[in-house]
Curated annotation (Swiss-Prot):
InterPro entries: Flagellar_FlhD, FlhD_sf. Keywords: Activator, Bacterial flagellum biogenesis, Cytoplasm, Disulfide bond, DNA-binding, Transcription, Transcription regulation. This is Flagellar transcriptional regulator FlhD. One of its GO terms (cellular component) is cytoplasm. The keyword Disulfide bond applies. Gene3D superfamilies: Flagellar transcriptional activator FlhD. It holds the Pfam family FlhD.
Length: 105
């Protein structure tokens, strides 16, 4: 995979992420903020973006989304194949809820 193809893929992921984030925020702001790991300031910015601004942001050569965990325990919980998937997901959600919301510095 060449550099240009990777950059195209990053732009596509960025646009999909931004569109999904806006949709989630419009439908249930509080749940979206929790699921996206963002604070109210970021939510306000995202919800107000025009289509032109979305495309401009998506055109960045860096990913706008990232993994919300740096803890290997959360990664192990999310990838485990235990029988009680709902309990496993709840456990991961509890651990991730303790992670701070992202801030723009």
């Amino acid at each position: 995979m060449g550099t240009n193809q990777i950059l195209d893929e990053i732009r596509e992921v960025n646009l999909s992420y931004l569109l999904l984030a806006q949709q989630m925020l419009r439908e249930d702001r509080v749940a979206a903020m929790y699921r996206l790991g963002i604070d109210e300031d970021i939510a306000d910015i995202l919800i107000k973006l025009t289509n032109s601004q979305l495309l401009k942001m998506a055109g960045s050569n860096m990913l706008l989304c990232r993994f919300r965990f740096d803890d290997s325990l959360i990664a192990e919980i999310l990838t485990s194949h235990k029988q009680d998937r709902a309990l496993t997901q709840s456990h991961a959600a509890i651990l991730m809820a303790g992670q701070p919301a992202e801030k723009i510095s």
